[in-house]
A protein has these predicted regions:
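Radical SAM enzyme core and accessory elements
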Residues: 2-9, 29-30, 44, 49-159, ...
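A structural motif corresponding to the C-terminal lobe/cap of the Radical SAM core domain
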Residues: 2-12, 20, 40-42, 49, ...
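Structural motif
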Residues: 3, 203-206, 381
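Glycine-rich beta-alpha loop elements in corrinoid/cobalamin-binding modules
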Residues: 11-14, 19-53, 79, 86-119, ...
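Flexible loop/turn segments at secondary-structure boundaries
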Residues: 12-15, 44-45, 212-216, 242-244, ...
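Short, acidic/polar
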Residues: 188-195, 245-250, 363-372, 420-427, ...
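Radical SAM [4Fe-4S] cluster-binding motif and immediate context
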Residues: 302-473
Length: 703
């Protein structure tokens, strides 16, 4: 019988498992196949950051003269004495070390520490444990600088050889590295792989390659297997080949692997394991399209069994509480729905299956999966990695979580659209939502319309306001350099972002420079967006980014530097009063955005306060307590006494009891009918009263 070993190669992420192998394992195990999985990414990082390996690194010669590296070398004994303790702390094994780490004298400090200034300032932003994680992360980054200089330039904590894989016209470009002798990191990587092969004895090994930064490591592992286990068949798939290698004509990669899978890997791997007809798979003989797809429901619950949960490291690369979610915390990564429910943005790879094909499952099914993953991992923290989670499904999932009394925390990606009302955001927060990330992109209504984003600044502002008021942190993905964007619009976009930070709508953000890709609407038809391709050449190996020509009239590099510098200050809470044009080098126009643009949008009424007889009313608070002159409503941290007329009290007791049954829909039309049993007054007038407003944050919601 075939046995499959699924491998996450170095380096993807170190704080929690990347979910690809877990989803594949879950599906294939339910189909009766023998499947094991391994995360070489986290296992190798633990080996690299160990006393044994660092002793070997410090024995290597530092090339040239570098004052910072020489300082690290001079503190060799401090690094080798502390490294194992630091890794144990970051794995959560020895939290008591936090106080010692924060003294400022325990860890050796080199160049990465220079930007933080006085360590005592950190305690105004972070608690002791978080401060210690932040300092340990700087410490590992200093060591990474040494490793890059002495062992291999390809090393970074969460990527390996990324620049090699970013634009490979032919496979020979990366093979020039593969024919070189292995460096010490690659040797350790293959030693870890050897242990997995010996323990599991697979007949097939599958590598997930989600990003360019793990292609080289995956190929090194495959090379090792071909040399030492030529009978093992090797498959590779994931985001990188599905995006960049779809039109591949260069067959050089098949000297290292046997199958290259595109898009979702469940069915292709099932066919390989069962010796069936290949689907969406390259072999050295050519491409096999085949037929069939696995639905999101059939894909089912991921299975994280077998992954080394005690070895993941929580890192803090920034003091910003929202920005650090990507590297801090052991999140169970899951996908609510397959694809994007919008799938129309001009910059997005909307022609690819993982975006284009939208499928979902009922909320109850998804929450069943969540409970199963909790049993597997012991963790109640989730990151839903959807391209954009659907608001309607988030509402139903939140209701199901509350109905079951499930205690979880979660964050996800969204579109900042009008359906995120104030009450929906309160519902999501009550169900454990702590943060959302979404695209504000160019922050220009003209360009948002041109890129078919489907939202405008006004909608985004209201959605962000509602998330923020509900206590949900907000991260904004930002973009510059979109075709036809002027220098004035670049300045104005920064002003919009400044006002949003000033208003407390955004907790963190990141600027991306627009890249035209072959799978996006803008890459398919550049002329429709006011630019033209530089050439129509198709590479034999990887094809993704499209070079284009535009009469821009300004230095896009300087614009990017200004935007990044401003954002760095905004996320630290300063620079918000500085005129935005002053962040840019050279002659730059002042903003043309009205100084009160965002403030004016924030005072617009929320859709949750517009009476809709078809809307659902829910009560998610504890049972109210009747008093002589009204009700006492208990929140998590306080209680509020509200005075009502006797008939209002009786109505609300009945309403809240009925609306607390989250298994059935109770509408405002039904609530109005119920009100007529207690009063001849207008229900709408009562609904629009200050009394009703006071009950909303305590759990009386319109969704």
């Amino acid at each position: 019988m075939e046995k499959l070993l699924l491998v996450t190669p170095p380096f993807v992420q170190v704080n929690c498992p990347y979910p690809a192998t877990a989803y594949l394992s879950g599906y294939l195990r339910r189909r009766g196949f023998d499947v094991a999985q391994a995360d070489l990414s986290v296992e190798l990082i633990g080996t690299v950051f160990s006393r044994d390996f660092l002793e070997r690194v410090f024995d290597l010669r530092i090339p040239g003269e570098d004052e910072n590296l020489e300082r690290i070398q001079a503190m060799r004994t401090r690094y080798t004495a502390t490294i194992d303790a630091v890794v144990d702390f970051l794995r959560g094994r020895d939290p008591g070390l936090a106080q010692l780490i924060c003294t400022g004298e325990f860890l050796p400090q080199a160049g990465r520490f220079e930007a933080i200034g006085d360590l005592s300032d950190l305690f105004g932003t972070l608690g002791t444990a978080e401060c210690a994680k932040f300092l340990c992360t700087l410490y590992l980054q200093d060591l990474s600088d040494l490793i890059r200089a002495t062992v291999t330039e390809h090393f970074e904590i969460v990527r390996y050889g990324e620049r090699l894989a970013m634009a490979i016209g032919s496979f020979a470009e990366i093979e020039t590295v593969l024919v070189e002798p292995m460096n010490p990191i690659e040797e350790r990587m293959c030693e870890l792989l050897e242990r997995k092969i010996t323990a599991e004895r697979p007949t097939i090994v599958g590598f997930t390659i989600p990003f360019p930064g793990c292609l080289l490591a995956a190929l090194r592992c495959a090379q090792y297997l071909k040399q030492h286990y030529p009978g093992i068949r090797i498959a590779a798939g994931g985001g990188y080949p599905s995006t960049e290698l779809r039109t591949m004509s260069d067959r050089g990669i098949f000297r290292y692997i046997d199958y290259l899978i595109l898009d979702d890997g469940e069915l292709p791997l099932e066919r390989i394991l069962s010796d069936g007809e290949l689907v969406r798979t390259y072999t050295r003989d050519g491409y096999h399209e085949g037929e069939g797809n696995v639905t999101h429901k059939e894909r089912g619950c991921p299975d994280f069994t077998g992954l080394p949960f005690d070895r993941y490291l929580s890192l803090l690369e920034t003091t910003n509480p929202m920005h650090r979610l990507w590297t801090d915390g052991r999140w169970n990564k899951m996908t609510i729905a397959h694809g994007c429910y919008w799938a129309k943005c001009a910059f997005c790879d909307t022609s690819l299956d993982y975006i284009r094909r939208y499928e979902s499952v009922p909320a109850a099914t998804f929450v069943d999966w969540m409970e199963e993953v909790i049993r597997q991992t012991g963790s109640r923290s989730f990151h839903f990695t959807d391209e954009a989670a659907p608001p309607k499904l988030l509402k139903e999932i939140s209701l199901e979580i509350l109905r079951r009394g499930l205690c979880v925390s979660w964050w996800t990606n969204v579109r900042f659209e009008s359906r995120y009302t104030g009450d929906l955001c309160l519902l999501m927060a009550a169900a454990g939502c702590i943060a959302v990330s979404g695209g504000l992109e160019v922050a220009s209504d003209r360009l948002l319309k041109k890129m078919n984003k489907g939202v405008d600044i006004a909608q985004a502002t209201l959605a962000m306001r509602n998330f923020s008021y509900a206590g949900i942190m907000v991260h904004a993905y930002l973009m510059y350099g979109f075709p036809t964007q002027t220098l004035q619009e670049s300045v104005d976009s920064l002003e919009v972002v400044r006002q949003m930070f000033r208003a407390g709508l955004i907790d963190s953000a990141f600027w991306h420079r627009y890249a035209m890709t072959v799978h996006s609407p803008s890459g398919t038809d550049p002329e429709a967006f006011g630019v033209r391709r530089r050439n129509a050449h198709v590479h034999a190996f990887a094809n993704n980014e499209v070079a284009f020509v535009e009469n821009r009239g300004y230095d896009i590099r300087l614009v990017g530097e200004g935007l990044d510098e401003a954002l760095r200050h905004y996320m630290a809470g300063d620079g918000l009063d500085r005129p935005v044009h002053k962040w840019f080098a050279g002659k730059t126009p002042r903003t043309a955005v009205d100084a009160s643009l965002i403030a004016d949008q924030m005072i617009r009424p929320d859709a949750s306060r517009l009476f809709d007889e078809n809307a659902r009313v829910v009560w998610i608070g504890p049972p109210p307590v009747r008093q002589e002159d009204g009700l006492v409503l208990h929140g998590a941290s306080s209680a509020r006494k509200l005075k009502f007329k006797p008939h209002e009290t009786e109505f609300l007791l009945c309403l809240m009891q009925t609306a607390s049954d989250l298994s059935r829909k109770f509408t405002f039309g039904e609530a109005a009918e119920l009100f007529r049993h207690y009063s001849e007054e207008s229900f709408v007038a009562f609904y629009l009263s200050k009394k009703w407003d006071l009950m909303r944050p305590l759990g009386l919601l319109q969704i």
